[in-house]
Amino acid sequence: MDLAAGSSFTSIDGMRVRFVREGRGPVVVLLHGSGSSLDAFDEIAARLSPSCDVLRLDLPGFGMTGPRPDRDYRIEAYVAFLGRFLDEQSVADCTLVGNSLGGNIAWNFALSFPDRVERLVLMNATGYPGKSLPTAIRLARNPLTRPLVRRAGSRGAVARNLRGAVGPRFTVSEEMIDRVHAMTSRPGNNAAFVDFANTDQTDRTAELRGLRVPTLVLRGDGIDGQHFARDIPDCQEIVVAGVGHLMPEEAPVEVADAILGFR
């Protein structure tokens, strides 16, 4: 499994950042969730690239980009990093799409740099305090299990986490388990995940009522949508039946069609 095939790399903030850019047209930037990588968007990128300039990357702490040298996993650090990455790619503005953690980064970026975001698409995005946490993050925060998570996650644990994160209509494949396990097992990534999970984050959700970027919320029907559709002015929402937290891989056709149809 050559996961680096077709990838490019650039140096930002002391990291060798992996990214893939393909297609022509308006720029669409895809941000993955925690414990994931740009590969989660393979099918979506294939559907968007005939009419869009699709840019996706492994976020700091994940995939082939790996840990931040300064171990700073605050959302504001991700926002600053994303701005530098877009500058390096000569992207002035874009449609910004994020799943889970990627959605959290995306809406915070839109709050900080609204003139750089033409449209915002949030897939099962996070960021509201008090939300129930995924099992992997709970384990990373527990002092008793934290050392185990920091050292390594077995393939079996990865399989259990993936199967627990998807909806009833999706079957986690062996190939998906192998890919995610290969990425999370890269040197430093498990430790980076623990650092991320134990980072105190600033709550900016009160600012969402002032966001003036056109926004589309996508969520699975079994997922807590938090309050984005309520708080963001003139926000559109699409609920996809039978889909869990890993929407880019569970419903790539619906997601790609929603992005292309969002005007």
Q: Could you say what each language-model-derived stretch is?
A:
Residues 191-231:
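Conserved serine/cysteine hydrolase catalytic core
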